[in-house]
Amino acid sequence: EKVQLAAGLDENKNLTEAAQQRGLACLARFVGRLSAVQPNRLRIVATNALRQAKNGHEFIQKAAEILPKPIEIIAGREEARLIYLGVSHTMENSGRRLVIDIGGGSTELIIGEEFEPIHTESLQMGCVAYTKAFFAEGEINHKSFDKAVFAARKELSTIANTYKNAGWDTVVGSSGTIKACRQITVNMGWSNAQENLTREGLEKLKDKDRKS
């Protein structure tokens, strides 16, 4: 369920009451599914939004009244590791893979083989954070787009050499943002429903956005 806690971070990095209530309501709807899980097999974690939120402890205290176990705020690389494990258990072994997960406040990139992550990284670039930083008015233009690309390249430059040297055979996107991009390329006729998201499709999407 889409909650987008990161969208509820105000200018002081505090979660707004509305964002907290969205998150708590989601947890209340979800908690019933946890009743069949043994407590010793259950781990409840929070990621970037609560890592960033100065008042994250308030949300965790409220959530403790709903959940069977306390929330653990995990580091970015641990988030990346867990993402990789989740993806690897849903796919056939296909050599070395790069897994990309674009979240609301951060993006995780992991290179691994089978069930073993080799390189894990979490970068401060997410779809909600970039929307607020570069497209706050809901408009995409050349200037704002180029600023967003520059910021993303700056983040990626910190890991580019390591990841290029490690190499990969396939790329897997695990986030809603990537799924949305693929669906748009299908709807626009730039790829068919059986194809993966391609660089060609992304380039066409980029060009159309910049012309809008």
Briefly describe each language-model feature range.
Residues 96-106, 110:
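A generic, well-ordered mixed alpha/beta core segment in the N-terminal half of proteins
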